[in-house]
């Protein structure tokens, strides 16, 4: 079982507050999704991004956990970065 964080912030390039979760005047609720595979994590991330009309400057989620350990990160484009890889954060 995996968990992936789903969250957004305002984009400073669009005069939005990057410390708030309001995007285009709409509050975007943070969520944690539980799924069975990395592929499902990637799918739910892209659905969250598309359903909330997020840009790359809004995306703050994507941390992937197995149990209590973070094992990777899913970037805005849906790519999975394994812990220890170049773009893992």
Task: Name each region found by the language model.
Residues 5-9, 33-36, 65, 75-77:
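A structural detector for beta-sheet-dominated domains
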Residues 36-57:
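A short, charged, amphipathic alpha-helix used as a generic interaction element across diverse proteins
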Residues 12-14, 43, 79-84:
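Residues in flexible loops and secondary-structure boundaries
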Residues 17-21, 47, 85-89:
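Surface-exposed beta-strand edges and their flanking turn/coil or helix-capping segments
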Residues 50-89:
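Short, mixed-charge low-complexity intrinsically disordered segments
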Residues 1-28:
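Short aromatic-glycine-(Arg/Gly/Cys) micro-motifs in beta-strand/loop hairpins
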Residues 25-39:
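A short, exposed loop/beta-hairpin motif centered on an aromatic-Gly-Thr core
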């Amino acid at each position: 079982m995996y968990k992936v964080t789903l969250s957004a912030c305002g984009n400073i390039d669009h005069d939005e507050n990057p410390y708030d979760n309001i995007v285009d005047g709409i509050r975007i609720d943070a969520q944690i999704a539980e799924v069975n595979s990395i592929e499902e994590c990637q799918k739910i991330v892209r659905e969250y991004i598309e359903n909330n009309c997020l840009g790359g400057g809004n995306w703050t989620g994507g941390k992937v956990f197995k149990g209590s350990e973070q094992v990777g990160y899913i970037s805005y484009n849906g790519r999975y970065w394994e812990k220890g890889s170049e773009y893992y954060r």
